[in-house]
């Protein structure tokens, strides 16, 4: 943002609000939740003006953002997983949001089934009130990946140009893959069959073939390999386990099936 504002002040045509963190108390204490309450703020929207401090804060945030041309809710992943840059969309709002998301310079647009979407999130609350909101996930929790930051910045300026907010030069954006997961057609999951230490063999964004080795689970006491983790389908490994300790059922990765990679159209 500093680069663009220093060089192109005459390119701005409207107001852009930037919120570095919606949970500054959590940033200060290096936690996702609200300190003392251990409460995930992104599970209490739209909030309540007559509720406790946390619900009141959530309600004020929704009121502040409601009515914007577009809201972009930017997240890193959690500390357990690393993700390629992607936008996640509830299928209930796909018709409005997918065409917008395709201008955002992300690698993947992932449309979820309605049954898997949490209704208490900021994005769901704003979209339900008619304010278009995109959820961006990229990288790994508690870290900043400069490469992804630059990619997201180009995407933001592309979107602002689309909405007439930015009138200066606009970078070209990549063509996003659009995956529909309402019925599990495009995405498959890798879950740990046992507990142990997970050692990945593939980075996120890697192309894999069916039954190709993507990681191993090792017994931490003996060093013995107790499970080989193989790709269930050919495609792209767009989520990879970053945190090594796993339990039975832990998510270790997600594969975007090959057919979704070749379609690339809505």
Report residues per predicted region.
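Structured catalytic-domain cores with a bias toward divalent-metal coordination
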Residues: 1-266
């Amino acid at each position: 943002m500093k680069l663009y504002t220093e060089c192109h002040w005459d390119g701005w045509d409207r107001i852009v609000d930037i919120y570095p963190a919606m949970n500054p108390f959590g940033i200060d204490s290096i936690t996702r939740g609200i300190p003392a309450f251990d409460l995930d703020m992104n599970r209490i929207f739209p909030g309540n003006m007559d509720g406790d401090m946390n619900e009141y804060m959530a309600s004020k945030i929704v009121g502040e953002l409601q009515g914007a041309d577009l809201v972009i809710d930017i997240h890193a992943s959690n500390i357990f997983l690393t993700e390629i840059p992607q936008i996640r969309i509830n299928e209930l709002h796909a018709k409005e949001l997918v065409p917008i998301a395709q201008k955002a310079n992300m690698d993947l647009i992932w449309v979820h089934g309605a049954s898997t979407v949490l209704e208490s999130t900021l994005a769901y609350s704003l979209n339900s009130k008619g304010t278009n909101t995109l959820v961006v996930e990229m990288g790994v929790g508690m870290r900043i990946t400069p490469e992804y930051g630059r990619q997201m910045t180009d995407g933001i300026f592309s979107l602002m140009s689309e909405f007439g907010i930015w009138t200066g030069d606009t970078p070209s954006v990549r063509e996003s893959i659009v995956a529909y997961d309402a019925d599990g057609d495009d995405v498959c999951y890798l879950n740990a069959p046992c507990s142990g230490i997970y050692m990945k063999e593939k980075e996120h964004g890697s192309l894999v073939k069916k039954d190709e080795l993507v990681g191993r689970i090792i017994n931490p006491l003996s060093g013995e390999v107790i499970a080989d983790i193989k790709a269930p389908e050919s495609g792209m490994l767009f989520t990879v386990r970053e945190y090594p300790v796993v339990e039975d059922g832990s998510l270790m990765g997600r594969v975007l099936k090959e057919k979704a990679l070749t379609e690339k159209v809505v």
